[in-house]
Amino acid sequence: MTIMRKKHPLLKMINHSFIDLPTPSNISSWWNFGSLLGVCLIIQILTGLFLAMHYTSDTTTAFSSVAHICRDVNYGSLIRYLHANGASMFFICLFIHVGRGIYYGSYTLLETWNIGIILLLTTMATAFVGYVLPWGQMSFWGATVITNLLSAIPYVGSTLVEWIWGGFSVDKATLTRFFAFHFILPFIITALVLVHLLFLHETGSNNPSGLNSNSDKIPFHPYYTIKDLLGILLLLMVLMFLVLFFPDVLGDPDNYTPANPLNTPAHIKPEWYFLFAYAILRSIPNKLGGVLALILSILILAAFPLLNFSKQHGLVYRPITQVLYWIFIANLLVLTWIGGQPVEYPFTMIGQIXSICYFTIIIIFMPIASTIENNILKLH
């Protein structure tokens, strides 16, 4: 069998990626989240496939078909809530994965980092179109508000919005195409994941010390397969706890009301994992400015390699930048909270302050801190 896995064209690829892969001996549990994301993706594709067998992408029957899945299909409600809460687990793992990349300086692996940003954007697009499918109140109005933002694009905006809608409002054509997008995008994500891994295995993984670990590597199997397995079991435990005890805790009650274009909900908001970006969007009174800030809130990740002036790799031995990093994380949590609050004082003001902090910490304070640290250590 040893000869087989090293010689066979297909098994050889699997062997080089998951069995004999040379891995730094000191990577911590923060490196588990890549494999957890893979598991989340598999769960989402499988549960989504079974949901698609019973779902109908028609405005008159979409809401009823979701109710039918929950009531009449064997384990339908389990599959539906696994899919909905699986998306939340996916984004929790995704944010931790990106946060670990920032903390330990993984953005120096340029190709891997940039493909990761594309993956994040694609996943966000997938989650957004998926949220529209149950055709509840928040689905309809979320789709209307967010797609309408494209009308802020000068000259072509209005035409672009009508082109995406397939008419003059969010209607049957919109729902059908969103279902098509939601079905195809996870497979595009899977392809991008393979490219992400391809680039990662070209350079090898980063490690907590930030030093070159070529002299101290161990095979991925069995050391990290067993470690990943523990992470997967913990993930599944948390997911099943959510699904079986609190299936609706991360959802919106408004989505249990069928979509009604004549009745606007008191407070339109997206799913919790978009609230930080939504808060940044709302903090700018100008429509085009808000849209640009929304896009930049994600694309700013691409600036990390450019704004990295430190002579050290990662933040492990950089106390000033460490403090800034944790302020940034706290700020992100504040933005998430503000995104779910009504548009009124003091929430609007807090949102504006937090949005300014979000960008200034990354663009101004972190580069200044790294320069100060270089001077303190006389590494310049």
UniProtKB/Swiss-Prot annotation:
Residues that coordinate or bind heme b b566: H97, H196
Assigned keywords, A-Z: Electron transport, Heme, Iron, Membrane, Metal-binding, Mitochondrion, Mitochondrion inner membrane, Respiratory chain, Transmembrane, Transmembrane helix, Transport, Ubiquinone
Parts of the chain that traverse the membrane: 33-53, 77-98, 113-133, 178-198, 226-246, 288-308, 320-340, 347-367
Positions annotated to bind a ubiquinone: H201
Recorded GO MF terms: metal ion binding; ubiquinol-cytochrome-c reductase activity
Family to which the UniProt record says this protein belongs: Belongs to the cytochrome b family.
Protein source organism: Rhipidomys macconnelli
Cofactor: how bound: Binds 2 heme b groups non-covalently.
Misc note: Heme 1 (or BL or b562) is low-potential and absorbs at about 562 nm, and heme 2 (or BH or b566) is high-potential and absorbs at about 566 nm.
PANTHER family reported for this sequence: CYTOCHROME B
Protein name, per record: Cytochrome b
Entry cofactors: heme b
Record GO cellular component, one term: mitochondrial inner membrane
InterPro entries named among the record's database cross-references: Cyt_b/b6_C, Cyt_b/b6_C_sf, Cyt_b/b6_N, Cytb/b6-like_sf, Cytochrome_b, Cytochrome_b_C_euk/bac, Cytochrome_b_N_euk/bac, Di-haem_cyt_TM
Designated gene of the protein: MT-CYB
SUPFAM superfamilies listed in its UniProt record: a domain/subunit of cytochrome bc1 complex (Ubiquinol-cytochrome c reductase), Transmembrane di-heme cytochromes
Subunit structure: The cytochrome bc1 complex contains 11 subunits: 3 respiratory subunits (MT-CYB, CYC1 and UQCRFS1), 2 core proteins (UQCRC1 and UQCRC2) and 6 low-molecular weight proteins (UQCRH/QCR6, UQCRB/QCR7, UQCRQ/QCR8, UQCR10/QCR9, UQCR11/QCR10 and a cleavage product of UQCRFS1). This cytochrome bc1 complex then forms a dimer.
Membrane disposition: Multi-pass membrane protein
